[in-house]
Amino acid sequence: MRALVTGAAGFIGSNLVDRLLADGHGVVGVDDLSSGRAANLDGARGQSGFAFVEADVVGADLIGLLAEAKPEVVYHLAAQIDVRRSVADPQFDAMVNVIGAVRLAEAARRSGVRKIVNASSGGAIYGVPKNYPTNEAAPADPASPYGAAKLAAEAYLNSFRHLYGLDCTHIAPANVYGPRQEPHGEAGVVAVFARALLAGEPTTVFGDGSNTRDYVFVDDVVDAFVRASGDAGSGQRFNVGTGVETSDRTLHTVVATEVGAPDQPRSAPARLGDLKRSCLDARKAEMVLSWWARVRLDDGVRATVDYFRGC
């Protein structure tokens, strides 16, 4: 299979590129390197089945790019992922996350692409749900422009499916962590703790430490993207998570124990807009995609800490 990955130099995108190449597929990686790191693709660059194009989904000639690459499947992971930036500059967020997706869909349907596997959001789309773990039937109620944009991108891609037969599936991950994660931002808290504790620097837990997230290892998330490239799940969203809530304070203990560092984070006031809880029900992915989370938190944290030890 010939595949194209947008956001290929990013955390999840680069791990997906490696998986696709290991599975024997040809891969074209596309990234503007505004947030992705070229070094994440060092292993891929040495392989004959990989080609890289530095371009962004908003301004590039995507029709020409896809016509030349001739992918069967496009994995769309290029995005503006900072929720706080989406609040500060919703127009920029919409330009990247909505217009970028629309431009990609238009280019894909003109270029004979069979399917787009789209990276959605497992937390931001649902806002503050009534039930945990949260399944895909929960009402979409985004509490941020980022969540609204991700939901809009799903709707646009689904409309192209109805109008032109361009297949699509949406993967909505929980809080992804693992090697190559950038050590900043709320979503990168495992990497933030790991890097700081390894360096002997202070760490911070916001609020009383009871906020919970559903932490899912990057290899498991990549596996969901790969499984979604077939015919199953056409036009549907799939939550990808463990169904287990881990508090900020507990997570710090897990990372500190793996590092061998004191489990003594500083406390800071809760941050405005932070969700109190987030946890996903992934039983639909189990039933339709035969996917489930295989990596336990302690094993995933160990792999992440080992990665940062070597950086």
Where are these regions (language model features)?
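N-terminal Rossmann-like NAD(P)+-binding domain of SDR-like oxidoreductases, especially those catalyzing
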Residues: 1-176
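Hydrophobic aliphatic residues
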Residues: 45, 78, 108, 185, ...
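Residue-level signature of the cytosolic catalytic core of signaling kinases
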Residues: 46, 58, 182-186, 244, ...
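Conserved donor sugar-nucleotide recognition element shared by glycan-biosynthetic enzymes
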Residues: 145, 153, 186, 248, ...
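Hydrophobic alpha-helix immediately C-terminal to the catalytic Tyr-X-X-X-Lys motif of short-chain
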Residues: 152, 156, 160, 193, ...
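Heptad-repeat alpha-helical coiled-coil signaling segments
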Residues: 175, 181-182, 211-213
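C-terminal substrate-binding subdomain of Rossmann-fold SDR/epimerase-dehydratase oxidoreductases
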Residues: 195-311
